[in-house]
Amino acid sequence: MELIPAIDLLEGNCVRLVQGNYNKVTKFNSDPVSQALRWEDMGASRLHIVDLDAARQGFSSNDDVIKQIAKSLSIPIQIGGGIRTSKRAKELLDYGIDRVIIGTAALEDPRLVEDLASAFPKKIVLGIDAKEGKVATRGWIEQSDVRTEDLIKQFSNAKIAAIISTDISTDGTLEGPNLKSLTSVAKVSNAPVIASGGIGSLADLISLTTLEKAGVTGVIVGRALYDNKFSLEEAIKVLLNIDLQDQPFNAKNIA
């Protein structure tokens, strides 16, 4: 299972929100580029970025920072937040971003996801943020009546790279992932599922690996890393050991 550290951008800073509440902001680093490099140096195989300004207002004020991060890192980067047009998606890919995450637009303009996935196979990720099983949009400010599973089924034939399933009620709380919700998502998804929200301990990561065979192949971690609940190296090691235990014996796995 791949562990993906997160950087949330707000007004040029690296921050974290609690349950998507813009009034509950903790600033962790005023230099997101150095933070991104730190995660890479500590062993991250991919970086997850959320442009909170763009998610809330529909346009970005963080492009200079995003470009600098893309230029500075050698690992692939995925980014979400306010990507609601093909122009914006292409712009980010041109910056050197590996995958773009479509959230609000997936609900409001499903054709956009299908067209982008066809034009850029395996470069488009479906980001579904939900609370109590219903999809939220526009930076989690608006709540829809659409069930998560129903939205996923709409894109069963689209060439998307993955689905990021974020449980808003657990995001930033460190109270553990919503395994029930993730199980439901994995059951209806044809694409790999990446879990997001609630990770607060190494035990939470271990519990999440029970869903790997069901299709949950990655996990995004933010606050737990910033609050030093565990280190990135520790988390990667734990997940690697579990992966090795699940494999048949192979002498090459022994360092």
Swiss-Prot record:
The active site is at residues 8, 129. Its EC number is 5.3.1.16. Keywords: Amino-acid biosynthesis, Cytoplasm, Histidine biosynthesis, Isomerase. Gene3D superfamilies: Aldolase class I (3.20.20.70). The keyword Cytoplasm applies. GO terms for cellular component: cytoplasm. It is found in: Cytoplasm. Coiled coil: none annotated. The keyword Cytoplasm applies. It is an enzyme of class 5 (isomerase). It catalyses: 1-(5-phospho-beta-D-ribosyl)-5-[(5-phospho-beta-D-ribosylamino)methylideneamino]imidazole-4-carboxamide = 5-[(5-phospho-1-deoxy-D-ribulos-1-ylimino)methylamino]-1-(5-phospho-beta-D-ribosyl)imidazole-4-carboxamide. Pathway: Amino-acid biosynthesis; L-histidine biosynthesis; L-histidine from 5-phospho-alpha-D-ribose 1-diphosphate: step 4/9. GO terms for biological process: L-histidine biosynthetic process; L-tryptophan biosynthetic process. InterPro entries: Aldolase_TIM (IPR013785), His_biosynth (IPR006062), HisA_bact_arch (IPR006063), Isoase_HisA-like (IPR044524), Isoase_HisA-like_bact (IPR023016), RibuloseP-bd_barrel (IPR011060). Its main location: cytoplasm. One of its GO terms (molecular function) is 1-(5-phosphoribosyl)-5-[(5-phosphoribosylamino)methylideneamino]imidazole-4-carboxamide isomerase activity. Belongs to the HisA/HisF family. This is 1-(5-phosphoribosyl)-5-[(5-phosphoribosylamino)methylideneamino] imidazole-4-carboxamide isomerase. It comes from Prochlorococcus marinus (strain MIT 9211).
